[in-house]
């Protein structure tokens, strides 16, 4: 049981466990905004309702800062937030969001870090992901996971 990230008529398909998908989104959150990424990492530590309530309160506090408000440098990034909090089981992102994520991670060297099943990985998961995201944008295809 796990996730599959792909797009219609794509030569790319990423299969992994939910932990790998969480790691992928954690790395994107860190690259997008350091403060938010640091907080997003604590989501894995939530076990009780009170943990989630505290997490949500702090997430709202961070996202209410000027850089996320109208006119701020990240004011048009609600789709990134939506991606980070979407269901692990099924979801999709638009070609425009694929391009945004590509732009966020394109210059990062992930040093062979993987998010797919290790037995299926060539150690270049993030390099392939960058190509996949750009391909989705160019072909106007939604990226989807299930």
Regions inferred by a protein language model and the residue ranges of each:
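Acidic (Asp/Glu-rich) sequence patches and key acidic residues
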Residues: 1-146
């Amino acid at each position: 049981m796990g996730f599959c990230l792909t797009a219609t008529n794509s030569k790319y398909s990423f299969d992994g466990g939910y932990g790998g998908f969480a790691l992928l989104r954690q790395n994107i959150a860190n690259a997008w905004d350091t403060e938010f990424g640091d907080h997003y990492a604590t989501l894995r530590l939530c076990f009780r309702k009170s943990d989630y309530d505290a997490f949500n309160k702090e997430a709202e506090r961070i996202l209410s800062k000027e850089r996320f408000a109208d006119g701020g440098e990240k004011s048009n990034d609600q789709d990134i937030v939506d991606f980070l909090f979407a269901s692990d089981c099924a979801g999709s992102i638009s070609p425009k969001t694929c391009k945004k994520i590509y732009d966020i991670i394109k210059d990062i060297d992930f040093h062979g870090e993987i998010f797919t099943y290790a037995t299926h990985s060539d150690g270049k998961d993030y390099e392939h992901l960058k190509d996949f995201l750009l391909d989705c944008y160019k072909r106007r295809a939604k990226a989807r996971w299930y």
